[in-house]
C-alpha cells in the first residue's frame, strides 16, 4: 500500500507487480511527489513511470460526521459506489479492492452488496478484489470471522475475481489452517486468493516477514 511517489518507487524496487494506492480519493486524485499532471491523468502517470498495474481501495461504508478526523476518515471519493468505480476505471485503475481501513466499520454484508453493484457496472473493465485485512472496527467479525468460508463463497458469487484475506500470523485467531481453507475455496471456484499484511507487521523485522511469507506459501 502506497500513498506517495517515494513509496511507489520502494514498492517497485522491492519487486511489486501491482501498486496498491490506499486512501486514494477519485474526486481529489493526489499522489505526493508525482510530476505535475492533470488530475484525471494521475493513475496513467503512475503506470507510465512504473510499468505496473495500479489498484485502489474503495470502502463500502458511510462517511461519518462525528467530528473525529484521522488519516483513515472516509471521504466521498473513497466510498465503494458505482459512480466512484466508473471514475476509477476511466482514470485507468486496473483493480478495485473492496475492503475497510482501520475503524471505518466495513462489514462483509456491505462488501457483498458493493461487489455485486460494481461487478455489474465495471466488472468487465477492472479486476474486483474483495475481503478484509483485519476486522475494520467490526468486533463481531474478528479472528476467523474476519472472513469465513461462507463469506468467501458469497463474495465469489457476487463477482469477486480475487479473494483478499489476512496473512496467517498478522491478526489474532486467523490461522494458517483457516487461510488454507479459504484459499482452497477460492481456487476451486476459479478465482485467485491474495494474502495481505494490513497490520503492525508491515514494519516488522526480516525474520518475522519471512515467517509470514512461508506460512502464506504453505497455506
Where are these regions (language model features)?
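Conserved mixed alpha/beta catalytic, RNA-binding, or beta-rich assembly cores of soluble enzyme
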Residues: 1-44, 49-215
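C-terminal functional extensions of proteins
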Residues: 217-219
